[in-house]
């Protein structure tokens, strides 16, 4: 199941009340409690607390996304020199745009779709991009034109992209 709508509804509710904490609870199982997500948008005065034992897992299913995803690393946009799918088309997994006082905390995991992790040698250039054209590349955490952003005590795993993108934040 796609847990994005439930998480987003909780964020929207907390923000409408003036702010607070949205808790993504974990458990003590070996792999943690999984929440499949596509694009979670933080709002003013909201902390997203991904607790220890919780895993926000990037959905591999295009049908879960609210937009048409682009696969792979590079895409073609006429007139643009370097076009990375995660930077110019696909939305970050967790993001904020022109928001203030947002936090992502809690000790949990943000787990992406890596490229090459299915290979024995997932480091060298020859195998690193194996499977890349078939993956939905997202930036795990992206904040744009925001103020007072805190990212602490979260673990980013198996990302195929920039881990954190902060643009014109103060």
Language-model features: locations:
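Extracellular/periplasmic carbohydrate-active domains that bind, remodel
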Residues: 1-170
């Amino acid at each position: 199941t796609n847990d994005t709508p439930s998480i987003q509804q909780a964020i929207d509710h907390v923000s409408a009340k003036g702010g607070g904490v949205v808790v993504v609870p974990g458990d003590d199982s070996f792999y943690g409690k999984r929440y499949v997500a596509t694009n979670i948008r933080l709002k003013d005065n909201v902390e997203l607390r991904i607790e220890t034992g919780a895993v926000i897992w990037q959905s591999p299913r295009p049908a879960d996304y609210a937009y048409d995803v682009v696969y792979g690393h590079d895409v073609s946009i006429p007139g643009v020199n370097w076009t990375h799918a995660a930077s110019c088309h696909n939305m970050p997994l967790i993001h904020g745009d022109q928001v203030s006082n947002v936090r992502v905390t809690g000790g949990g995991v943000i787990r992406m779709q890596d490229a090459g992790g299915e290979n024995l040698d997932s480091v060298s250039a020859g195998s690193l991009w194996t499977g890349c054209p078939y993956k939905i590349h997202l930036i795990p955490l992206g904040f744009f034109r925001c103020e007072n952003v805190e990212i602490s005590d979260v673990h980013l795993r198996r990302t195929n992209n920039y881990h954190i993108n902060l643009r014109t934040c103060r």
